[in-house]
């Protein structure tokens, strides 16, 4: 892909220094801000142009595209998509989906780059962008590169697309059936479970109840109707006060398990049949106990590696 759209590094740095795109939006691994103050339709469009340019510069002329169910997502999604198309990059539109479905699509389709409009577990007045290139999240340096390129395009809209390159096009792809089918193949329950699923009125409500029913569970839905104002509780299950209704429903229905998902479905907290909130360390220990023995039995040539974040305690390390 020709690189003539990119300004010299010194020019881009100067553009970024005077750019109206707030630097606070461009975080270590994603882009996130308050709608109307940080994220507007105008600035998210030039960010889309920069994302499209990034994909094209790495040889990808098609990107997967999804959005969560926030109130601001329809308008911002339209603007972000227009920016990507401006660059000459094509969009494979996954529609309104949880983030894990975008990640799944990058690993199971021919399209290895993707863009997700979401602010994850943040309050309703936030929105943001998660970017995947070659099946991996961007580094902080690459995120800053997106800002610099977007600032350049804001000043020089004539440079957004190489003159001989036509504007991009869009087509739809329904990834949910393949996602559910893949999990159904991998997960076999020893007995049917009664599960309370709390989606916090966020986008996981479009997928999670169907997924658990496909696994043979009896599902009691709690706040699974999509409402981007999040009227019942903040969509962050790692805060215990947001779990009180789930705990109560698990006890009321004598459920085997409670499942709470965050605003875009990439965080989960479990509640036991006794109404006890299971912390992340304990959940990971259960997964380690289930996964590692089978892995070690089939991978005699090397020891397995386990990746976990810095918030995990030494209890998990000792268990591994």
What are these regions (language model features)?
Residues 57-126, 181, 211-271:
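N-terminal small/polar loop signature for handling phosphorylated ligands or for N-terminal nucleophile
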Residues 47-60, 248-252, 289-298:
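A short, N-terminal amphipathic alpha-helix
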Residues 101, 144-181, 185, 273-320:
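Proline/glycine-rich low-complexity loops and linkers
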Residues 127-253:
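Gly/Ser/Thr-enriched, mixed-charge loops and adjacent short helices
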Residues 131-134, 269-273:
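Short beta-strand-to-turn element immediately C-terminal to the catalytic PLP-Schiff-base lysine
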Residues 60-64, 192-196, 218, 302-305:
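Residues that mark the start of a beta-strand
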Residues 73-78, 143, 205-209, 317:
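Short, surface-exposed alpha-helical segments at coil->helix boundaries
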